Amino acid sequence: MLFPISMSATEFLLASVIFCLVFWVIRASRPQVPKGLKNPPGPWGWPLIGHMLTLGKNPHLALSRMSQQYGDVLQIRIGSTPVVVLSGLDTIRQALVRQGDDFKGRPDLYTFTLISNGQSMSFSPDSGPVWAARRRLAQNGLKSFSIASDPASSTSCYLEEHVSKEAEVLISTLQELMAGPGHFNPYRYVVVSVTNVICAICFGRRYDHNHQELLSLVNLNNNFGEVVGSGNPADFIPILRYLPNPSLNAFKDLNEKFYSFMQKMVKEHYKTFEKGHIRDITDSLIEHCQEKQLDENANVQLSDEKIINIVLDLFGAGFDTVTTAISWSLMYLVMNPRVQRKIQEELDTVIGRSRRPRLSDRSHLPYMEAFILETFRHSSFVPFTIPHSTTRDTSLKGFYIPKGRCVFVNQWQINHDQKLWVNPSEFLPERFLTPDGAIDKVLSEKVIIFGMGKRKCIGETIARWEVFLFLAILLQRVEFSVPLGVKVDMTPIYGLTMKHACCEHFQMQLRS
């Protein structure tokens, strides 16, 4: 039954005025689209929450499906915040490379302000000349203590020396586990080995596999990726920050612990610093700070706090991405014994057993390289880049994108795009090999995992080298497996870097 609602002419007029005023404010707050351009298309969203429910637990999958309907440039809302989503290799390359200056910003998201007190080189909204100079400084330090050769060592570079040492320790540790409980969770031990490599580069030291302080930090890292992954509702709906949120609280605690750890390491370096005797990246940054050197393009001086932030960025990026890549690789190896055997046959043919693999062997091991590429592509363990934002009003593919617009870059979609890949859901390293057995360079460049353009991961080259060398040394010496009947869960868990479920049933034996 319907009940009539009585309304006087005055009340009706007042309601109409309020409605028109609200409508006008909403329209006025929306940027005016220049002639010849149009707004990016997108689905209808719910009031207040926008498309938050549509994104679900796997935003990369939801947005990939959405791109099939609306195209490579689409727009959604999370809360009341508009977000442009980019898909498609050509579109993303156009935005991040050819129009790199337009898309090099970072959105001012709440969770980003919790990282390094809001001064993180990777997450800070700053994208100006000072940021660029600090990024170059970090790149140079990383290069000097990883790719550069160590005159006191027989290895080709510092990175090779550190990885070779840690891979041997890892094998010994796994042997002890096989002699004891007879099984292990590989992630638990790989993460310490990889962390020791970046610790050697940044701090000139390593840790035991049972070092409690280090374990407490690296084991909390999964929460970091869960919170800062693209689409966190707390970044777009402010009220959620004040409601009970265990993940967000753990994230705050993790960042405080990481910062305190880095602060302690930098202080120790200050106490033992010797001019002319630079031991690692932290020393090189302290030297820069003390000499108050000026960058050639920007007047950049480093405070003690900035040193901590740069080292924290390098440390965080240096262990999480590589650990995740190696961990996924081991999962694919036990799921595909045929592939593991082919890699080992190639290692035996090219290198043999009399010496350890070296970085210089990489170009002679195409099947190994194809396996790594397929692991990157199939897992797409970095589904989105860290969110970008536009630094000025711009357009892309005929669509208008105003300054300050948050931009999600869907790397998962590229790596599973049926226009680029035959049977993308199938794990097939051979897809990257030419008929004569070499790496297909054109196809390999279509795998996107480290971003593109001006915000591309500064450690990409080192990460690729490190993953290769760890796997080559391990697979030359040992064989990985799981017991018959054990089901391995390969379902990715969404985050900034997607992890797989914990697998405690790994086994290892030395190759005969």
Swiss-Prot record:
Lung, lymphocytes and placenta. Substrate binds at F224. Pathway: Steroid hormone biosynthesis; Lipid metabolism; fatty acid metabolism; Cofactor metabolism; retinol metabolism. It catalyses: an organic molecule + reduced [NADPH--hemoprotein reductase] + O2 = an alcohol + oxidized [NADPH--hemoprotein reductase] + H2O + H(+); estrone + reduced [NADPH--hemoprotein reductase] + O2 = 2-hydroxyestrone + oxidized [NADPH--hemoprotein reductase] + H2O + H(+); estrone + reduced [NADPH--hemoprotein reductase] + O2 = 4-hydroxyestrone + oxidized [NADPH--hemoprotein reductase] + H2O + H(+); estrone + reduced [NADPH--hemoprotein reductase] + O2 = 6alpha-hydroxyestrone + oxidized [NADPH--hemoprotein reductase] + H2O + H(+). Keywords: Cytoplasm, Endoplasmic reticulum, Fatty acid metabolism, Glycoprotein, Heme, Iron, Lipid biosynthesis, Lipid metabolism, Lyase, Membrane, Metal-binding, Microsome, Mitochondrion, Mitochondrion inner membrane, Monooxygenase, Oxidoreductase, Steroid biosynthesis. Changing P492R: In allele CYP1A1*11. GO terms for cellular component: endoplasmic reticulum membrane; intracellular membrane-bounded organelle; mitochondrial inner membrane; mitochondrion. Glycans are attached at S67. InterPro entries: Cyt_P450, Cyt_P450_CS, Cyt_P450_E_grp-I, Cyt_P450_E_grp-I_CYP1, Cyt_P450_sf. Interacts with cytosolic chaperones HSP70 and HSP90; this interaction is required for initial targeting to mitochondria. Interacts (via mitochondrial targeting signal) with TOMM40 (via N-terminus); this interaction is required for translocation across the mitochondrial outer membrane. PANTHER family: CYTOCHROME P450 1A, STEROID 17-ALPHA-HYDROXYLASE/17,20 LYASE. A cytochrome P450 monooxygenase involved in the metabolism of various endogenous substrates, including fatty acids, steroid hormones and vitamins. Mechanistically, uses molecular oxygen inserting one oxygen atom into a substrate, and reducing the second into a water molecule, with two electrons provided by NADPH via cytochrome P450 reductase (NADPH--hemoprotein reductase). Catalyzes the hydroxylation of carbon-hydrogen bonds. Belongs to the cytochrome P450 family. This is Cytochrome P450 1A1. The gene is CYP1A1.
